[in-house]
Amino acid sequence: MKKYLITCLSLVLLVFLGDYLYYENGNLYLHQKGEVTCFTGSDRESLYLDQGSGLEKFEIKGVDLNFGKPGYFSTEGAITEEEYLRWFQQIQTLGANTIRIYTIADPVFYEAFYQYNNNNLKPLYLIQGVWVDEYLSNSSCSALSDEFSQPFLTECKNAVDVIHGRKKIRESGHVFPVRYKRDISSWVYGYILGTEWEGDLVAFTNESDASVSQYNGDYLYTENAENFEIFLAAIGDQTIQ
């Protein structure tokens, strides 16, 4: 009996540990690692998308989607999967091919997006935005400071994990964390890191430190860049990693 209880307890602990490492910590990566590939591209004049026949020119015909609904706050997650599915159909009927959202949505949005694209030969594409803390954006701090950059980088990485269906996020008003389990990465055209950057934040960052080195990362680098541009390159590079 004692061995049985120890075994059961060990299994429960392993399940909780695996759940934490996979959905919250992110260090448990079970998918096979191979060559990094990308189905989108760009040059100085055009955007490209690979829809099965190699990269071809792609014109984004986009719709901004917010999460408000009459009678509810946008943070309440009141929109149902059926409503999202109907909206996606109407958006595509308009002739649009891409949806932009400004921040991480409720799991229902990603579930509906997954179901819609799985059941349609012509999918919609998503541009995932990352929200910026409005309080910090209007505070007297540099974007290069840990106070600003670390929470923003965490939010960027959260967005990537959400898109790949491996994230739990603890939100106010929820007893338990909300879980994102649908991998929609094959329909994500790109990310927009940040919303409308405050001019004061940009100016303060550029003027706050004259000794900031140019950034040379694994995927992004800068040359003769201002401090704020260096910040954006560093955040983008670390998000890709």
Predicted regions and their residues:
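N-terminal carbohydrate-binding accessory modules
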Residues: 20-90
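Hydrophobic alpha-helical membrane-insertion segments, chiefly the h-region
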Residues: 12-22
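N-terminal Sec-pathway targeting helices
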Residues: 1-13
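Alpha-helix termination/capping residues and helix-transition junctions
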Residues: 57, 93-95, 185
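Flexible loop residues that form catalytic
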Residues: 68, 104, 196
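Catalytic domains of carbohydrate-active enzymes, especially glycoside hydrolases
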Residues: 81-109, 125-127
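Hydrophobic faces of well-ordered beta-strands that scaffold small-molecule active sites
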Residues: 59-65, 97-101, 126-130, 191-193
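Active-site region of glycoside hydrolase catalytic domains
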Residues: 111, 119-241
